[in-house]
Each structure stands twice: as structure tokens, then as C-alpha cells.
Amino acid sequence: MKSYLAKPQEIERKWYVIDVAGKPLGRAASQIASILRGKNKPIYTPNVDTGDYVIVLNAEKVLLTGKKADQKMFRHHTLYPGGLKEMSYKDAIAKKADFVFYEAVRRMLPSGVLGRKMIKKLKVYKGEEHNNEAQKPEVLELKY
């Protein structure tokens, strides 16, 4: 029996809306990364982008367990000497919660061309409102 290989023309893409208020950051990000890769479909093929579109709401209300909010640092470098900038996750979520959630999901995807294609299907919003009603997204509840 031959293995099934999905072709890009055959893929049906759905839109999902996920509310992450009160959900742990890592658990929500890993499930969303799995949906973006297409691992929830029977036609999953590792070298083809078979994933669906995901709209994430309430990114600022995501939960960090333990002391991570204060102790874990969000770092980036400006590429100038001495340009390492760092802030705690509590401050980062207060300032740019959508970017923090976006980065958590991006780091769980492959790091090549296919991963860059997959991350473009993720839309992250602060608050309850989004502007993708025209796509008729389905509400999806995360497992944990």
C-alpha cells in the first residue's frame, strides 16, 4: 500500500477562532502550532503546508504558571554593541501581548521556508474583536 501524499491544490483550508483567556501560554501555543502545521488532519504530509488559518483572541489574558511572569525574561538585541534589551514577561505581555504569543507559536514551527509560510496563517489580536468575519471562522475550544 502506498503512502498518501497531499498536493497543494487538494488542500481545503478552514478558519478557526480560539479564545486563549486563562489558558497557559505554552500549551495553547503548541496546540495552535499543530493546527497551523495540519497535524489535526488525516492528510498531513510533513513537506506540504496542509494547515488551517487560526485567529487568536484575548492574547493579553494568557496565563503564565509559577513565577515565570516575573522571572522569565523576554530578550532581543538591537545589533549595536551593548544593545541587549530585556524585560520580564509580565511587562512584555502588558506592552505587546500579541507579539509575545506570536513568537511563542513561531518558535514551535519549523524554521525553514515552510515554517515561514505556516506562520502567515496566524492572526493574533488583543481583546475580543477581530476583522476576519468574512472568512466565517469556526469557534474551536482547546483541549487543555
From Swiss-Prot:
Record's GO cellular component terms: cytosolic large ribosomal subunit
Segments passing through the bilayer: none
Organism expressing this protein natively: Clostridium acetobutylicum (strain ATCC 824 / DSM 792 / JCM 1419 / IAM 19013 / LMG 5710 / NBRC 13948 / NRRL B-527 / VKM B-1787 / 2291 / W)
Pfam families: Ribosomal_L13 (PF00572)
Family statement drawn from the similarity comment of this UniProt entry: Belongs to the universal ribosomal protein uL13 family.
Gene: rplM
Entry function: This protein is one of the early assembly proteins of the 50S ribosomal subunit, although it is not seen to bind rRNA by itself. It is important during the early stages of 50S assembly.
Family annotation (SUPFAM superfamilies): Ribosomal protein L13 (SSF52161)
GO biological process assignments: negative regulation of translation; translation
Subunit structure of this chain's protein: Part of the 50S ribosomal subunit.
One GO MF term attached to the UniProt entry: mRNA binding
Protein name: Large ribosomal subunit protein uL13
Keywords per UniProt: Ribonucleoprotein, Ribosomal protein
